[in-house]
Amino acid sequence: DIGQGANTVMVQICADALGISASKFDLVMGDTDLTADAGKTSASRQTFVSGKAAQLAGERLRAKIIHLAEVSDRAAIHIEGEKLTAKDETGEHLIILSDILPQENGDVLTGEGTFDPPTTPLDENRQGSPYATYGFGAQIAEVEVDTSLGTTKVLRIAAAHDVGKTINPTQVEGQIHGGIAQGLGLALMEEYIQEVSENLHDYLMPTVGDMPSIEVMLIEDPEPLGPYGAKGIGEHALIPTAPAILGGIKHATGVAIHHLPATPDR
């Protein structure tokens, strides 16, 4: 988790798969002695890839509990301390975790999940499936241009994004707001010039005062491979923002900007 809320989403997904409250989870992250190498945080892959692994882990742990308690798949599972109960139409079945012989690492019951999205390389005709799924989105920007000073202010952005299935609406909207903020910086102010942009006085970044009004529309077209139909929303929130802003500038002034950022001199 690098700030996008992946830890919360992983727990939510696993809790749903296992069938217990997320409050019963104790998340361990970044411990190479306990956690497997799941790859890097990039390419909108955490909810889709790691989330699917979390779902599979929860489902496998639930299957073990169901088998141990000898209850139906519809059983409700509850845990309090070392007591695990599974209740279905036949009654309530109690499992005392301390009565179970622990594994070498001290764990009593475990569920593990891995997910490697299916892909196929491009053939000689450039046909194939290099990625398991794709994100889609569209943004519209309303801008105000001062033709005397050459400055641009973004007034409003409407963003519609297909997220497959929304796991955590607040975090999804926050991710889109963050992408738009980065896109705003890309479009209007962020530029690195060697020996000039040496600090944040010379390398400008958006502040809360630069942010426009944002309207987010979440489109849910479930992705069969993703956890409960979800897919990532990382780059997809950033990519359309600058083109939308530049389109607004051209519509207002007739000037096409071909080099970012769109500073007054350009």
Map each language-model feature to its residues.
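Conserved strand-to-helix beginnings and helix N-cap segments that scaffold or border functional pockets
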Residues: N7-T8
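C-terminal catalytic domains of large/alpha subunits in multi-subunit enzymes
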Residues: Q12-R266
